[in-house]
Amino acid sequence: MIKYALVGDVGGTNARLALCDIASGEISQAKTYSGLDYPSLEAVIRVYLEEHKVEVKDGCIAIACPITGDWVAMTNHTWAFSIAEMKKNLGFSHLEIINDFTAVSMAIPMLKKEHLIQFGGAEPVEGKPIAVYGAGTGLGVAHLVHVDKRWVSLPGEGGHVDFAPNSEEEAIILEILRAEIGHVSAERVLSGPGLVNLYRAIVKADNRLPENLKPKDITERALADSCTDCRRALSLFCVIMGRFGGNLALNLGTFGGVFIAGGIVPRFLEFFKASGFRAAFEDKGRFKEYVHDIPVYLIVHDNPGLLGSGAHLRQTLGHIL
């Protein structure tokens, strides 16, 4: 008989839940719920388990916020809870709550070739560190290392490091944004809102008034080639993505690969392929040769958060990935 665990990927808007075959790691019965419709994460879990008529005793939920102890308060949602209390209330034997990019990083060992698109570099070196980052509502970052037959995810808040410009245009962008918001983190330019910031700064640098555009508007106009400012913003976004990825590669010597997750880049894949991304990734001065062979991959799996939550839980329960 198949033994299932509950896995989840919870953001500021939606909660996506599924079942994970503990033996194989296969994900099934995925369903998305609007977080606005439920008073708590526990309530959503109860509805899911009732709808699917399944009893589970183990679970792992990935959440888009820092996890530093038993009390979890979501960054972009009103939900807050005690992990120990929810585990007890649900009657679980084991409940893990992890950061969303911890989950994405743990998905990487489970991905197949068809789940990845490579952007330059050579083959990954087995056993070497891995970096993963992705732009969405914010900028998520994690690293992954292999130690004693176990994968260890190194989460953090790397999206909030300083934005480090390396061209005259980028320096002007920094100056304009710093005057508006003070500290300018990488997330302020590498995210959905960050794309808007880039567009606004480009227009303001020319002493013009920017339109009130959303990230989707900027992307659509750039791809249609109907707005020079939007196209410049999207091009610059790709370049800064490259610079940031190259920095991650240098930090930990990620010869196991640098992986891009998140929902933004797949929306303009062909544009991204033709952009200055890879050149910027390798633009490291004296260390250009060092990063030259490090491969970069775009993750195109539908649910890396669910896959990684399952992988994390299975490893915690003693399985070798």
From Swiss-Prot:
One Gene Ontology term of the biological-process aspect is:
glycolytic process
State any GO CC term. Answer: cytosol
Q: Where in the cell is it found?
A: Cytoplasm
Gene3D superfamilies documented for this protein: 3.30.420.40, 3.40.367.20
Q: Which UniProt keywords apply?
A: ATP-binding, Cytoplasm, Glycolysis, Kinase, Nucleotide-binding, Transferase
Q: Which reaction does it catalyse?
A: D-glucose + ATP = D-glucose 6-phosphate + ADP + H(+)
Instruction: Name the enzyme's class.
Output: transferase
Know the name of this protein? Answer: Glucokinase
Organism source for this protein?
A: Shigella boydii serotype 18 (strain CDC 3083-94 / BS512)
Q: What is the lineage of its organism?
A: Bacteria, Pseudomonadati, Pseudomonadota, Gammaproteobacteria, Enterobacterales
What is this protein's gene name?
A: glk
